[in-house]
């Protein structure tokens, strides 16, 4: 045994428990197997590593080559799939080693054969002739034997034998015996077959030798035989082949975003025997690497799958790997991937107020104002809400030159993980001063997601440097003195400013310290200005202060120097002002003396400022010019030293810049000539200022220059030191000669400042070949010139910083042909100092032009730097996005539509634009804004508005003018650009409509909100703008009150072919029917007016309150004896229903739902409605009085109801907050609630419309006295009624009659009614003993006397007895004689108890005055409300289909029947029912059947019949039905029978008693139990005369052997009400209903002789008293004589005969013999051929019968009912009438021919008679015979008339009418019963099925007619009753 290593499974391998059995022990004939060949060497016994693969085995039952002789289901044992290792290289004598790892048992739960696979770790474990790689061996377990499915040989060689071992293992717990057959072919063989015996767990190795002879595949089978059947093992040898497999067979790639890439890997294994070349074939968007390759046997390659989708769909494709010879074999893998669109939400981090980040709008990222040259950073947030990675790219709109991009985003691309956020920085680095930069940043997710355009805006600000003063006046200074004044310079901006004054302080009389510097933001620096003149002269110099990134500032320095001999005029700032004015007017070229002379000669004049001007000769002359504003840059560059100047200079010097070059010495260089030229008309003196040690000087130092003359001078240079750099700016002042003496100035306005001349000279003293020192500097050079329009100069400032510790000289020289101007072009920069250089150019052309200049440092050519800048002339152009065409959508006439139009400014200048629409189109077209400013690189969207005037198509041409922004409003732009735009629009007409023309809210609860949606439709092709109006129709709207219907919006717009939804919210405030009309008008954008109103739809609503009603009431327990009618009054249900029908008051709606709102014991009452719920009275400790109320939601909305006790309305408070003292009322309520005297179940509920619910009210009689409890009955959002629960508990054996009220109202009776109805007044005995009542009728007599001795009130039974718990009916007759109200107070005495005075009240009315409003039948609302109710008690399984029957108004002596059903809803319980007889004081009520059984889930019909008496009266009865469970009754009868048997046994059994034994006095209950014990004797109970309702206060004698008691029955109560009217009054008021009622007349009953004698015996003594024998004998004699006389009297006999014969009616005198014959023949046609005796009297009688006497006019069920009964009766009558009509039609068709034949025969006879009359006179014999025939015919006719009279008399008999009514009633009952069972559908349409026609012989005889045809011809005759005479 050895341990397996190198396993791939996680589970630990198991050791083999049972060792293998040696093959030699079972098979001694091993040498036969070798067959003379050498035994193969045994494999080395080293422990080889074995790999266990986790590939699942196939789940098939058995391999195809396996055959079983028996059903495998009975013999194959299911086993788990395990992985085993088979050692096939060892000897046949060695035991096989098996590794059994633990694998999940569920992997092969459905497999009949276990699969086992194994694979060695390497091919080194196999023998020489074994395959290089062993395959997995699938094993199975069959009949307890574990064996491989097949043995597979691979890698074999021809002619060599290869052995594989077949391992069999016994997996069962019993000894296994089997046999096997050798393979059939000669290529596979094994040892000689012998029986195999395997013990449990033992393994057997069977060697199988394969010896091939040909290179082909071999297959065979090795069969095993067991007692259970046979099975086989496949033997297969295959050739080397190509085989590649993919693991796994399918590959699910991760979810990927569109445009992104994801990858996955799988293995491609070469499980074949040959090296295999493969090629992959796949489809987009999948890629596979490597796509081709070569795999050696056993080698695996990892394939990479790349997925890059282009659309968001689910991909499921198959990749195919082609391999093998000719690439004909293939292996495939299923690739599955899901592509989703990535989504990026862009937001701004750390938002500023100027930012815009709203959804649906342009996002704006505002950087604010950033200093030039600085960088600002803002961040945006990218959120990926999708489930995939979101790759993105960020692009900033590319400019034509990258150097001009002020915005940058280092994050050009990236990925945002699912659900995460990423922040991206955007930088703003402005380079152009005072410009607003706009750019657009596009954030583009990969794939199909839409990009987000982010607008970035920033403003570049520069320094804001200013001087304290712009003029420093030193006044006059003596020669040799020095004057100094302070001056501060300030930077008002927050960015750093570099400044420098353009003056050489060493060589100038004016000095500024410091001359250069740096100002940080918001800083100020003090400058020191000094004046030290060298000559007595007027000194004035305008010094420029150069500022980097700002226009230069100019500082005027002035001072006058006086000497002892020379005192020039003092220069003042006013002189400068006048000078500049004179410069603009051209007067500066004249010296002051000439100006004085001209002023004196009036050739010049002075203006209001004192400046000189040429006098104005004419008003039309132009005014004198003023000094213009000159931009600082222009003044700096064009100051007269160059070819271009603003004003001509008065004096100039050339050259202004001199370069001496290298002057190493020792000889001085040649001086450079200078030319000084005077352009004025006066003599000028020029003086050069020079310090003594300056290496540069000019000779002569001073000189005078005549007017318009020039002077030559020389510039000298003498470097004092070798190898040095020298640069200097020489200064000279030129002044008019006359100004040297102030006395020469007569007019101060002619004063003129001096002019300052400068010459910049440079040179160095470096020897040739000596290297100049290396400069260290930085040069801030922008790449682009600022944007300017055509013809305008553009300027830039450069900053040169000397970072070295030595001096730095520079010189700037533009490239040849370059048109840039540099100032200064040379200079000296001190160590650490900076030099500001200004550059100017005039751009030309719209394309970028490069400007190149060279910077040379330290006068060395090797330190030359080329600098390039670009400029262009900015074009005035815009880019239009719509290709100069714009289309409007179709627009409604009168309305407007808009269309956006976007254009972009590609230039770097802000442009002004203006749209110009012609005057005729301004009513149709409008644009907003029509003019405006568009910043550089900005996109601007305009809105065009199209307003058509008519239904047509429009075409417009509109122009847009563009010019440079920044011009004054009145200035005309120098250049403009013109664009034309084409606009197309269509005007249409349309209208709105509503999807529903009538919108009904239905029923809505008052004060509640309900919403409906109104769908508007726009079926047109244009957008409509509408406004809705709401008008209330009913009820009328009240001013200043909001409407009950609100619209969520009243205005809106609808696109074409669309619909819009308006939410309507209704909140009615009162109960009413609301109606509204919604109209609309279309809005016009032109004049902002609404069009004509048009109706849109109608809205209706019914505002209701919840409506609850009480349908029925029933009682149980102690209240069981109270009638339902009386109970209805006790609970004031009529008044309660009337209250519930009314609207609630506002106080009742204070709390719309049940709420705890009170802190007191008695909560406040918010309702004015109060009612009594009187539970009646019952004795102490009697069963509770239980009342069931049937509640119904009679409304149309759902409702919630609740009974709230005082405790339910009270807020729970702490004990310390409770009220300390309670009054008697509170204490009483607490006692009632704590003891639960009144209980309600359930206390609350919800009811849907039409739903009913039963509520149980219970009152427990636990305390003697009267109990009260206020209960609030609350209907949510409805009524709130206070119910006063009242209950009375009576002491035992106390008399008590419960009077509900002291007043009683009789039913109103019409006056003149001779037979007023009987009315009922009920008295209920609530005590436990019988009571006797007595009505005192004396007061009734008094009322009678007052009313003309007419009995207004009459009590029919003024005295009677009331049993405990029952109700007595006191009958009254109220008979008014006047239309008024009668009242009487009648005392009712309860004998032995109290008396009560009852106030009776009756109303008499005149029926002729009231008409139809006369209340003929108004018992109570219980009469109608409970007709269709069904009050179901909890636990009740049987119920009535109707709990109340209201017959309404009926005539007296009528019989009314109703069919009802008894339903058993139980599924397994049979119920027996028994109706209790309910006797009435008048009339009769019966139920049929009285008893019966209702099967489970069955229905039993029964009929309730009321037979009204002859008296007009009110009927009110409660019919009680007792219900018994059949199962309990059987048990009861069984126990009763056992009890009777035991009773009989005890009666025959006797006991011998030992008299000597003392009577036991101890308790028998303590005796020990004995096996047998004689039962005590049964004693007869004494009849109890006490009431049965008495409780257990009276001890009862214990029954020795109690008799089983029957089970307590369930009770069902059926109420019946009716009002019987006298026949005359019923006909007068209900004439149309009279035929619907059947008048039941009782038949005279014949008594038996015995009964008659008994009756006579009973009545005679009471009526006559005792009679003597003499009187009896006398009476007999007298009567005998009289009777004998009558028998002998003939006159008496004749009189009797005449009285029996009916008198001849008056119409008999019109008798005609011929008509009689004709009628006789006509009536006998139908019956004579069939019946032997003519009986046409039946038909005659039927035809003469009055309509009201026919059977169909006496329906058995009385008045037609509602519902199914009424429909059933009507349809049954229709069916009967149709059948009768069909029968009559058939009879007419059958007898038609016969009638025609009879008529022809009769006509022939008549003709014969007439002809006979004309002929000769007959003989007397013929006349006698004719007379005899006539006599016979007359006798027949008389006989027929007598029979007809008899039939008519029979029909008028009550018995016949009763029989007809019984038959019809039975038929209708059968139909309704069948309909209730579903056998007949009464509501279906009637169908008439015509019978097939048949031929009837012309002559009908009884023999020719079949029996069925006879039945069709004859009418059925109703049999008569047998009791008729």
Curated annotation (Swiss-Prot):
Instruction: State any GO BP term from the record.
Output: flagellated sperm motility
The residue ranges flagged as biased composition, category Acidic residues, are 1763-1804
> How does this protein sit in the membrane?
Single-pass membrane protein; Single-pass type I membrane protein
Question: What disease is mentioned for this protein?
Answer: Spermatogenic failure 40: An autosomal recessive infertility disorder characterized by severely reduced or absent sperm motility, due to multiple morphologic anomalies such as absent, short, bent, coiled and irregular-caliber tails. Patient spermatozoa may also show morphologic defects of the sperm head.
Q: What is the effect of changing residue 1016 to R?
A: In SPGF40; uncertain significance
Alphabetical keyword list: Cell membrane, Cell projection, Cilium, Cilium biogenesis/degradation, Coiled coil, Cytoplasm, Cytoplasmic vesicle, Disease variant, Flagellum, Membrane, Transmembrane, Transmembrane helix
Please state every residue range assigned to the domain named MSP: 877-986
Q: Tell me, how does this one assemble?
A: Interacts with CFAP47.
Q: What is the name of this protein?
A: Cilia- and flagella-associated protein 65
UniProt signal peptide:
none
Recorded hits in PANTHER family, A to Z, give: CILIA- AND FLAGELLA-ASSOCIATED PROTEIN 65
What exactly does this protein do? Plays a role in flagellar formation and sperm motility.
- The answer on whether this UniProt entry bears the keyword Cell membrane reads yes
Biased region (Basic and acidic residues) positions are: 1649-1661, 1739-1762
UniProt lists the family membership as follows: Belongs to the CFAP65 family.
Q: Name one GO molecular function term.
A: RNA binding
Q: What GO terms fall under cellular component here?
A: acrosomal membrane; acrosomal vesicle; cytoplasm; plasma membrane; sperm flagellum; sperm midpiece
Coiled-coil positions = 1525-1550
- Write one Pfam family the protein is assigned to: Ig_CFAP65__9th
Kindly indicate whether the keyword Lyase belongs to this entry.
no
TM spans (from-to): 188-208
Region: Disordered, residue numbers:
1645-1667, 1736-1823
Q: Name its cellular compartments.
A: Cell projection, Cilium, Flagellum membrane; Cytoplasmic vesicle, Secretory vesicle, Acrosome membrane; Cytoplasm
